[in-house]
Amino acid sequence: MRGRVAGSCAPLGLLLVCLRLPGLFARSIGAVEEKVSQNLGTNLPQLGQPSLTGPPNSEHPQPALDLRSNDLARAPLKLSVPPSDGFPPAGGSAVQRWPLSGRLPAMYSWPPEDPWLMMAAAAADRLGEALPEELSYLSSAAALAPGSGPLPGESSPDATDLSPEASHLHQDSESRRLPRSNPLGPGGKILSQRPPWSLIYRVLPDHPWGTLNPSVSWGGGGPGTGWGTRPMPHPGGIWGINNQPPGTSWGNINRYPGGSWGNINRYPGGSWGNIHLYPGINNPFPPGVLRPPGSSWNTPAGFPNPPSPGLQWG
């Protein structure tokens, strides 16, 4: 009987223990949360200053923060949010840890403004303050209009306060503003004002297009000879001429002028295609006479031809 009672009480005891454990865990977690919130309120170091509550770390000593040279580094530090994974921040105290429930304190809520815009504005302000006097002077001088600069005879009030490097840069900027001289001279200005087709002055006035000016050479071939051509030995000749004297016809190979086209006679005045040795002769008889007197066209075939040479055609 006792064994049965002990066996039935064991499951009941385990059940009661399981029901009590969550309550105990919840109470312990609540106590830890209260302690952490109190520690955060009292031991939270000021922003931009190292933590004084944490134990010193001999292996990784923290260098002293330079407030003058670390202005840009403080802006991201103000906007940085502690990690939410439960690990303490580097260099902080070991007590500073987030609660296990995941709830964030009210003091670590996000700001209403965009953090990136705030970072950019802060960086621009710090960068403007960190610019040297020379760069700020150059940036202000570049913003001025080209005609609003001081006269050469006048001296600016801050010219004496500038360093030698700044004065040298100022002289360079002034020299760049001066108008540059034209390397081509007055001729270059004239060419720049003329259109690309200004070469028409080579053409004679009051003449149609294409008439060349004999006083201007167009390629070294002599005045009025065309683009880069050689002067003709006989201006009166025509294309394909082998004759030396001028005035001969096209393709004539005679040695004397006045011959007709294709004539191979040695004397001028011959007819076209004539191969006789004497010019102007197509018949041994005078011009207009084909047969001598007494001859007839109706000579019978049985009779011989008369011995006169005029009976035959030449």
Swiss-Prot record:
Biased composition annotated in UniProt, kind: Basic and acidic residues: 167-177
Single GO biological process annotation from the record: extracellular matrix organization
UniProt entry keywords in alphabetical sequence: Extracellular matrix, Secreted, Signal
UniProt subunit comment: Binds to numerous extracellular matrix proteins.
Compositionally skewed regions (Pro residues) per UniProt: 303-314
Protein name: Uncharacterized protein C6orf15 homolog
Feature: compositional bias, Polar residues: 41-60
Entry keyword annotation includes Signal: yes
Subcellular location: Secreted, Extracellular space, Extracellular matrix
Reported tissue expression: Taste cell specific.
One Gene Ontology term, aspect cellular component: extracellular region
Top-rank taxon, per record: Eukaryota
Pfam family, one: STG
Signal sequence extent: 1-26
Low complexity: bias regions: 147-157
Ranges where the record places region Disordered: 41-65, 77-96, 147-191, 292-314
